[in-house]
Structure formats: C-alpha cells, structure tokens
Regions:
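Domain-level signature for soluble enzymes in the chorismate/prephenate branch of the shikimate pathway
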Residues: 1-278
Length: 278
C-alpha cells in the first residue's frame, strides 16, 4: 500500500467501480477520492490540481488494452507513478426477480466484451448498452424496470439491487491493470518490490526500423513485457509504439538500453518509471 497520506485521488465513477477498488488497493480505504464521469475528467482533475493523483484502467487480461486510455497517455503531459492489478469479478445486478424479465443490460464496453459469452448463452435477446462505467449501469438498473447492470458485487448494496447471477465473466483469473497518474514523478511506495518503465516512441517508416529498436533491450538483458501500437493520426499510416519493460530507469541495463533506443527514434517520451503495487 502507498505511503502517501495526503492529497485527493480521482477515479472513474460513480461509487462502486473497479477503479475505486484500485484506488483503495493503492492508497487505502481512508483515501480522499473523487469520482469523475470519464477518463478525460479524471486526468483533467490531475492537470488542474484538483487531484494529486488519477487512476485509470489501461489493460484487461481477457479483453486487451483500453485504447482510449493509451491515447490519453500520449495526449496528456502527465507521469505514470504507479501500477496496480485488480481482480475483476462481474455480476449481473437487477431489480427483477426473473432473468427472463431483463430486456436491457448496461455496462462499460469492456465489461460487456468480457461477459460476451455468458450473455450470449443466457440472455441472447437482451439489448447490450454501453455506458461510461459499470457503476453507471448499476445505477440505471436501480431505476429502470427490465434493466440490469454488470458490476462489482459492492454495487448491489450501493444501488439496492440483487445479484441475479454472479461471476459471469468469460474465463477465470480476469484482472485489470490500472495506472496511477500524477503531474510530476514521485515515489508512492516506501519499499517497492518491483518496477516498470513505460515509453512511447515513433520510428522512421522504413524496413527494419522497429527491429532495430528492439536490439538494445536484448543486448542489455532488459525484459519487454508489453508492446502496443496506436495510429499517429497524421494521415500517413504512421504509428506510435508503447512499450513497458521490467525494471527502473535507474537500473544500469535499463538506462543504457533506453539511451540507445532513443537515439534511433523520431519521437521519444518517457511516460514513467514506477513501482508495481502488490
């Protein structure tokens, strides 16, 4: 858990989201947290100084990367200062007593995708409606007859719903990674056990350029744990590449690998070198 004891933390609300669970996992149950309607508003709060930190989902191990969050890492001039992984257990919450009376299912698009198989088997005719968060879906289900939301079980108590079905996500071990964002680099753990370093870069659109970028990591024994690409939006089919590697930028091997890689890029930015919260 973080050693930080002051400052506001912004997260994707309303209350009862997995984002709020991530906040509590990092900063504790007593942390002062504010719910925001979307990722942009979370990072707006950090940039404006309303919040010291912002917590956003970046990747789910079942459904992949949250692409909007990835784009925001490039668009905003903020730093990643921490990461936490939260187990995701989705539940179907409703006012209805019978599953067949549910005609609409509200949830975040990621949750709908993560429960696609279960919904197709058990509720093939129910309309699936994407909303800004799972908690918003639960909130809607609490005021609409014939509606259900997919959310964490804590949302059932918050919104006065019953769990018509529990653990409806496709596959076991479903987890989501969340990033902690801040205006400036800072250490949020006193005794971190593991570090990651994240960068974004672009390379010339010529044969072998991306391969050349990878060689310094192999030469310096640096383990890459993730690579993603996103369109550069310049009209020329160019891409920005996001890479996570194990280790701190202060580690000699990582530092030397990144220096060699930066020299081969057209655009380069260190997004953060940060602790991974247990």
């Amino acid at each position: 858990m973080s050693s930080v004891t002051d400052g506001v933390v912004a997260f994707l609300g309303p209350a009862g989201t997995f984002s709020e669970q991530a906040v509590r996992a990092v900063f504790g149950r007593e942390a002062k947290a504010i719910a925001e309607p979307d990722f942009d508003a979370v990072l707006d709060a950090v940039e404006s100084g309303e919040a010291r930190f912002g917590v956003i989902a970046i990747e789910n191990n079942t459904n992949g990367t949250v692409t909007h969050a990835l784009d925001l890492l490039l668009e905003r001039r903020l730093c990643i200062v921490g990461e936490v992984s939260v187990p995701v257990v989705h539940n179907l919450l409703t006012l209805e007593k019978r599953l067949e009376d549910v005609r609409r299912v509200y949830a975040h698009a990621q949750a709908l995708a993560q429960c696609r198989g279960w919904l197709s088997r058990h509720m093939p005719d129910a309309e699936r409606i994407a909303v800004s968060s799972n908690a918003e879906g639960a909130s809607r289900a609490s005021i609409e007859r014939g509606a259900a939301g997919i959310a964490a079980i804590v949302a059932a108590d918050i919104y006065g719903l019953r769990a018509a079905a529990k653990s409806i996500q496709d596959g076991e071990g479903n987890r989501t990674r969340f990033l902690v964002m801040a205006r400036e680099p800072e250490m949020i753990l006193e005794t971190p056990k593991a570090f990651k370093t994240s960068i974004v870069f672009s390379v010339p659109n010529v044969p072998g350029s991306l391969y050349d970028m990878m060689t310094p990591m192999a030469e310096n024994g640096v383990q890459m744990v993730r690579i993603e690409s996103r369109p550069a939006r310049n009209g020329f089919w160019d891409y920005n590449f996001f890479i996570d590697v194990e280790g701190s930028v202060e580690t000699p091997g990582v530092r030397e690998a990144l220096a060699a890689m930066e020299a081969r890029t057209e655009h380069w930015r260190l997004l953060g070198s940060y602790p991974v919260v247990d």
